[in-house]
Amino acid sequence: MICETEKRLLPGAACAVLFVHGILGSPAQFAPFLPLVPQDWSFCNLLLQGHGGGARDFSAASMAVWREQTRQAFAELRAQHETVVIAAHSMGTLFAVQEAVRSPVEGLFLLNVPLHVHVRPRALRNAWLNYGGTPRDPWGQAAVAAYGVERDRNVLHYAGWPPRFFELFGEIRRTRPLVRQLAVPCRAYFSERDELVSVRSARGFADVPQAVVTMLPHSGHAYYEAQEDLPLLQCGFRAMLQQCEKKR
């Protein structure tokens, strides 16, 4: 499990990427993309407070803290670089959209934006795996690998979790109308087999002129199918960085 923010801040670098994970997620989710960041770019792979620790650490955090963390991390990169791209997953995409509306952001690379949520049986199965089960297929293995909280079998330690999810639903409602205000290049990817984010979420980008929306037919919320979908994501990530670099 990753327990701290990973940074590469290069003196004199003109471009940077900010990576923001989702609720109960981890910076490890961006492992397929970090090697694609050009060597002359800076990056910050942010660890949100309450992640990388135990169940009670997560309870002690809040949406307001995570939002402010993202803003501060972006401001740090913005102060030192001409170009900043935000790459985000799930809840992190909500903060990315908010930041792009209020601040100069050169590009967004968004994975599974939760504008509309549903809970499929696989989500419950993954929750059990994260509690202490043994993953036996790539979907379960991906869910456990992306999980950003230490396993804890004491159910009392989870008592503070419901407020965090109520806050998440509030953040979704708050962000949904902001999407159509986006005026920056944006690549948004949605998994057709996502167990948490409804594909209805993709419709929110229909009126965003600079948004390119792509559906991933074989992937889920944390699992990205390796033969077709993941290479497509990596190609899109490279293209976004190249597009933003050319704008300089």
Residue ranges and their predicted role:
Residues W161-V179:
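Active-site nucleophile elbow and catalytic-triad environment of alpha/beta-hydrolase enzymes
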Residues A88-A96:
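Gly/Ala-rich beta-loop-alpha elbow adjacent to hydrolase catalytic centers
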Residues F109-V119:
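Active-site nucleophile loop of the alpha/beta-hydrolase fold
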Residues P38-A55:
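Conserved alpha/beta-hydrolase
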Residues S219-L232:
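Catalytic histidine-centered segment of alpha/beta-hydrolase-like enzymes
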Residues Q181-L182, A188-F190, D194:
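Short beta-strand/loop motif that positions the catalytic acidic residue
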Residues L24-L34:
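The serine-hydrolase catalytic nucleophile loop
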Residues P27, E195-S201:
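Conserved alpha/beta-hydrolase "acid-adjacent" motif
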